[in-house]
From Swiss-Prot:
Record family assignment: Belongs to the multi antimicrobial extrusion (MATE) (TC 2.A.66.1) family.
Biological classification of the source: Eukaryota, Viridiplantae, Streptophyta, Embryophyta, Tracheophyta
Pfam families named among the record's database cross-references: MatE (PF01554)
UniProt gene name: DTX30
Name of the protein described by the UniProt record: Protein DETOXIFICATION 30
Membrane topology according to the record: Multi-pass membrane protein
Location of this chain's protein in the cell: Membrane
GO biological process entries: response to nematode; xenobiotic detoxification by transmembrane export across the plasma membrane
Keyword terms: Membrane, Transmembrane, Transmembrane helix, Transport
Coiled-coil features, chain-numbered ranges: none
UniProt xrefs under InterPro entries: MATE_euk (IPR045069), MATE_fam (IPR002528)
KW Nuclease (keyword) present: no
Listed transmembrane segments: 64-86, 91-111, 136-156, 161-181, 197-217, 227-247, 277-297, 302-322, 349-369, 393-413, 419-439, 447-467
Length: 498
């Protein structure tokens, strides 16, 4: 189309050198040949990473706490209310969360690289295109909410829990559409290093959420319906606040208004979004499978209770890893877009070192206090003993799971989602799960065997990702990023999608 050609020429006629970005390097770092040079560049990069990772970690914790706070208040209503909210939050909303966050992660690649190259006008089109795709996905996923009761009954939940969860899930349908707008919007802002404003919005949302939930439960006595109203409202508050921030003009050229271009070249965008979703969901569901398999052991109640405590701790520590994942994804995509391959590679190295140190510190603390911390979660002596026995593998898991998301963040920043999805399938589901079941059931190692086997799958996946990154030609990746940016309107290159 002539209109396409004109816009393409306009984009490509922009200044050849991208403008200096607030937290992107003005030029590529020189080769590092001395210890002093390494320390100097390390200190510079650490500041850039933590400028992004700090607010991202805080934001992850506050948004994670919305559901956690709702569960706490549900426990004051009734046992069945707590069960309903917990199952909806972990199974129904958890499944949708993985799909939506994964599909929204496509913007980390496209917006991050376009921003790094200074092609700001493309970001708004990418954002709108993702809104279209994720809202269509939300319509499909809403069927999961509508039919939650029969689905849960089919997989073995009791009639009482299935019925109560089914009703609460229907109340929570607005949440899935909030996800559809929120995650692309968050990635759009994240790619521009505007994470501080998202952290502030999430903090305000959490404070209001706790106050309003207390009011509708203790004051108005609305029960689970009140919990749903407030939780939906909290997520939509985050969405509206972010949109107001964008529409106010604070993003400059990155948002120039709504455009019909959002409906062009959707299939290429869908392919990258699906690859991102598959990559993330395979990781999220893998951790859920550990508890599922533990439920079929002889002492299922004790095994599941102990493993749930460990997974709860692992979940909170994962918020740190998720924040670092977001930071390194932005840094790598920005630097590749700006044609700074050495800086992108060094940013990865700094992130891996930082994440490893944090993971080791947390793990050592758990090992030191392994005789004390389990009693904070449970009073049953049998469960406490199992948690103590699982602490060493929990410590190893924390270290591995602190590094692995950083490597995945690089994959997103570089646009390797489809390849990593295949790696996850083989490492997790072809190797990890069968090995865990072999150790847990056939060799009678129980819950520890299941977890050890599946952790081995994560270790193999981490090794494969490390091997891929070590073999990467970062100059080639920078050139590929430039090629993607030159595809006007976001038509993703075959190199990105295959």
């Amino acid at each position: 189309m002539e209109e396409d050609k004109i816009l393409t020429e306009t984009l490509l006629s922009a200044a050849e050198e991208p403008p200096a970005l607030p937290f992107s390097s003005v030029e590529d770092i020189p080769p590092i040949t001395t210890v002093g040079g390494f320390v100097k560049e390390f200190n510079v990069e650490v500041k850039k990473l933590w400028y992004l990772a700090g607010p991202a970690i805080f934001m992850s914790i506050t948004q994670y706490s919305l559901g956690a706070a709702t569960q706490v208040f549900a426990g004051h209503i009734s046992t069945i209310a707590l069960a309903a909210v917990s199952v909806e939050n972990s199974v129904i909303a958890g499944f949708s969360f993985g799909v939506m966050l994964g599909m929204g992660s496509a913007l980390e690649t496209l917006c991050g690289q376009a921003f790094g190259a200074g092609k700001l006008s493309m970001l708004g089109v990418y954002l709108q295109r993702s809104w279209v795709i994720l809202n269509v996905t939300a319509v499909i996923l809403s069927l999961l909410y509508i039919f939650a009761a029969p689905i849960l009954a089919f997989i073995g939940q009791t009639p009482a829990i299935s019925s109560a969860t089914g009703i609460f899930s229907i109340y929570m349908i607005p949440q899935i559409f909030a996800y559809a707008v929120n995650y692309p919007t968050a990635k759009f802002l994240q790619s521009q290093s505007k994470i501080m404003v998202m952290a502030a919005i999430s903090a305000v949302a959490l404070v209001l959420h706790v106050l309003l939930t207390w009011f509708v439960i203790e004051g108005l006595q609305w029960g689970t319906a009140g919990l749903a109203v407030v939780l939906n409202a909290s997520w939509w508050f985050i969405v509206v606040a972010q949109l107001v921030y964008i529409f106010s003009g604070t993003c400059g050229e990155a948002w120039s208004g709504f455009s019909w271009e959002a409906f062009h070249n959707l299939w290429s965008f869908v392919r990258l979004s699906l690859a991102s979703a598959v990559m993330l969901c395979l990781e999220v569901w893998y951790l859920m499978a550990v508890i599922l398999f533990a439920g079929y052991l002889k002492n299922a109640e004790i095994s599941v209770a102990a493993l749930s405590i460990c997974m709860n701790i692992l979940g909170w520590t994962a918020m740190i890893a998720i924040g670092m994942n977001a930071a390194v994804s932005v840094r790598v995509s920005n630097e590749l877009g700006a044609k700074h391959p050495r800086t992108a590679k060094f940013s990865l190295l700094v992130a891996v070192i930082t994440s490893t140190v944090i993971g080791l510190a947390i793990s050592i603390a758990l090992l030191i206090f392994r005789d004390k911390y389990p009693s904070l979660f449970v009073g049953d002596e049998e469960v406490i003993i199992v948690v103590k026995d699982l602490t060493p593998i929990l410590a190893v898991s924390i270290v591995i799971n602190n590094v692995q998301p950083v490597l995945s963040g690089v994959a997103v920043g570089a646009g390797w989602q489809a390849v990593v999805a295949y790696v996850n399938i083989v490492c997790y589901y072809v190797f990890g799960i069968p090995f865990g079941l072999l150790l847990g059931y056939k060799l009678n190692f129980g819950v520890m065997g299941i977890w050890c086997g599946m952790l081995t799958g994560t270790v193999v996946q981490t090794i494969v990702l490390t091997w891929m990154i070590c073999r990467t030609n970062w100059d080639t990746e920078a050139a590929m990023a430039e090629g993607r940016i030159r595809e006007w309107g976001g038509e993703v290159s075959d190199q990105l999608l295959n």
